[in-house]
Amino acid sequence: MPDLDVGDGNIIHWEQHGNPQGKPALVVHGGPGSGAGEFWLRRFDLDRYRVILFDQRGCGRSRPHAADPATGMRHNTTWHLVADMEKLREHLRIPAWLLHGGSWGSTLILAYAQQHPSRVTEIVLAAVTMTRRADIDWLYRGVGRFFPAEWDRFRSLVDGDDVVGGYARLMESPDPAVRDKAELEWCTWEDTVMSGTHYRDRPPRARTGFVRICTHYFSHAAWLEEGVLLRHAHRLAGIPGVLIHGRLDLGSPLQAAWELHQAWPGSELIVTDAGHVIAEDVVRAALDRF
């Protein structure tokens, strides 16, 4: 399958499926660090769509992989990923494309679309998050009020109040036993809060890369000026957007999707009775509109 050299010693893996002459759509996976998967394809009518999947830096089949302790993380930030997406579009000679993703993927889509609005035809987001400091604090602290025993276990591994930063430091430890313990506890917490994810069941390499990238991004507030994606939502005016969010999503409360909908002229908000994982038929119905 194809790879693309995006600079800084990074090569991202990408692939395309469906109709080569169809409507181009880029899938932006979550995590950060989850990697793409062919399950995304079930959301698309592959007779109509040309679907491009790619693994963001450090995960999936992209190289170097964050599971390798020797892999540096300095060139793995939100803005590096935005630039990678644009390089991929140029490489594929696609004038503009639909963007689809969820959770962290929605943050990255918003960052890209606000930088390159003329390159985006439509946006379909599921489980919307803007990765603000308040969003990160809620996911790794605030929501603990619903899971007090699990939260106590999660935070007990680090000293002080900076839980996410503490885990990021543990994941950079030279001691593999320390890294393994941090990885297990992080994934246990994710599985507690994010219903239907099962991070602990992933292959060890994928799991390690996921936790290292997550802690790296979230300990740096994703290199986003606080609230910038909401403040710049007006840049999306004229781009049809569908926001799909579960009312029962404890990890990413509905408020963020509502605020984005209010700030994005012409967007539509669909609220389901789901948690963080949105039913595929709901997402497919939204994608079928375009």
Residue ranges and their predicted role:
Residues S118-G166:
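A catalytic-pocket lid/entrance helix-loop region that shapes and gates access to the active site
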Residues L236-A237, L243-H245:
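Short beta-strand/loop motif that positions the catalytic acidic residue
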Residues G251, T272-A285:
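Catalytic histidine-centered segment of alpha/beta-hydrolase-like enzymes
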